[in-house]
Amino acid sequence: MYTGEKIVLRLLKKNKGIEDIFDLGFPKDEEILKKSFDKRNSITVIAAPTGEGKTTTLYSILDYLNRPEINVTTIEDPVEIRVEGINQIEIDENTSFASSLRTVLRQDPDIILVGEIRDLETTEIA
């Protein structure tokens, strides 16, 4: 058995840009996706192992929904892709997902992306 520290390195293509949500391989689910984007007061959870496309999928959805009249905020650790027109909060040693989510809820958000929900407090607020 090995002991000690581990490191994870993620390499993202910097010049790739954000992919169109409908080019990601969900052809049968396109109408379901469009309907889910129109729902108010709902939560969508995307869960998958590392490297399975969660970030690509989430940013594609945000890009699809990103319009000046929609207040979109992300809470991430770290912010992986900077997106014009979206408010992005990066978690650090002085902030948490829960405290940031509480703050964002007071700012009349239309859409909130919470990058991780790993504790009961964040789960209850979401």
Where on the chain are the PLM-derived regions?
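Conserved P-loop NTPase nucleotide-binding/switch module
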Residues: I75-P78, L105-A126
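Amphipathic alpha-helical segments that mediate coupling or scaffolding at interfaces
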Residues: I61-Y64, N94, V104-Q107, E116
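P-loop NTP-binding catalytic core
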Residues: M1-A48, S60-T73, E84-N87, I91
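Flexible, glycine-rich phosphate/dinucleotide-binding loops
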Residues: I81
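Conserved Walker
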Residues: T56-T57
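Generic hydrophobic/aromatic pocket-lining and core-packing "Φ" positions
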Residues: L33, L62, L101, T123-A126
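Short glycine-rich substrate-engagement loop in P-loop NTPases that contacts/grips substrate
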Residues: Q88-V104
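Conserved glycine(s) of the Walker
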Residues: G53
